[in-house]
Amino acid sequence: MDSSNYFHDCKTMLSEHNESIESSNNDINGKQKEHIKKGNSENQDVDPDTNPDAVPDDDDDDDDNSNDESEYESSQMDSEKNKGSIKNSKNVVIYADGVYDMLHLGHMKQLEQAKKLFENTTLIVGVTSDNETKLFKGQVVQTLEERTETLKHIRWVDEIISPCPWVVTPEFLEKYKIDYVAHDDIPYANNQKKKKKKKSKGKSFSFDEENEDIYAWLKRAGKFKATQRTEGVSTTDLIVRILKNYEDYIERSLQRGIHPNELNIGVTKAQSIKMKKNLIRWGEKVTDELTKVTLTDKPLGTDFDQGVENLQVKFKELFKIWKNASNKLITDFTRKLEATSYLTSIQNIIDYEIENDDYASSNFDDETSS
């Protein structure tokens, strides 16, 4: 057998072997033995008329070639379909900007919505600077670095621009190849008083920062995608919750050893808050005691008298606490002003004047009597 027939024979046997995978194990073993037999007879002459394992005729070879060509054409068609699907699922760049101070559930849901606007999305998140946020919106709790670092740990975020411009411009969209800007649909006005006009490649767009939405031009240009806000969840709401219990947080911080200066309050304010909270707690205890006395099922008598005595003890304890706190407050105040020596000198002068008045009065009485 020449080499060309041998390789063709091997190709045929491999094809038969692949087709026999779905058949029984006996057929597979038979094909393997046949492959080994033909491999050992490489240098022997093969009679196509007598040997059933001989090389197929030219007609069978043409059929195999036609099958190979049809399979190739089919794979080419599948490849073209895949290319078409890739084009249809083109990557879309979405941009979402904000302050993202004290990152909360509302922020995370907004970023998730932006990420899922399209099947294949790259989400770029812009974080506003500390200075512009204070100028246009108000004081922030976290610094730019803290807000940026927090966003890095959100799964929906692909890229971060920090700091980002307060107002999105056409140049900004072109620079970062942004397709759409995602934000809630509520008009977002800029707090500046004057009207600015920005130019872009011979064209201009303007917005009244006091009355008009800064995203208005994006909406008109079809570059805006609205996201839904999470009701009842915002940074402002969180701060309001804290302020409602401001004195509770102050007292707890003082109990943990934090100095009043670190809380931006004076010593006098700190003592006042402590006294107020103590009085509130005492009042709650008195109310509970009165409730227990008045709601008792027992007849008034010894138990009632005992309850009154308990109230008297509580009042005495309150007076003692109040007196000690007042003395401490006055002492701290006088020490703070360093007025103790001044008050002592005034007292000495008063005592001296009284002594002189007594001496003069006694002399006057002696003279009149004589």
Curated annotation (Swiss-Prot):
EC number: 2.7.7.15
Top class in the EC scheme: transferase
A GO molecular-function annotation: phosphatidylcholine binding
InterPro entries: CCT, Cyt_trans-like, Pcy1-like, Rossmann-like_a/b/a_fold
Biased segments, Acidic residues type: 44-72
Annotated residues for binding of CTP: 99-107, 137, 183-184, 188, 229-233
Feature: compositional bias, Basic and acidic residues: 30-40
Catalytic activity field: phosphocholine + CTP + H(+) = CDP-choline + diphosphate
Pathway recorded for this protein: Phospholipid metabolism; phosphatidylcholine biosynthesis; phosphatidylcholine from phosphocholine: step 1/2
Coiled-coil spans in chain: none
Record-linked Gene3D superfamilies: HUPs
Keyword Aminoacyl-tRNA synthetase: no
Binding-site residues for substrate, renumbered to this chain: 137, 166
Chain spans, region Disordered: 17-85
Record's keyword terms, sorted: Lipid biosynthesis, Lipid metabolism, Nucleotidyltransferase, Phospholipid biosynthesis, Phospholipid metabolism, Transferase
Pfam family, one: CTP_transf_like
Role noted for this protein: Controls phosphatidylcholine synthesis.
Family, as annotated: Belongs to the cytidylyltransferase family.
Record's protein name: Choline-phosphate cytidylyltransferase
Organism field: Plasmodium falciparum (isolate K1 / Thailand)
Gene designation per UniProt: CTP
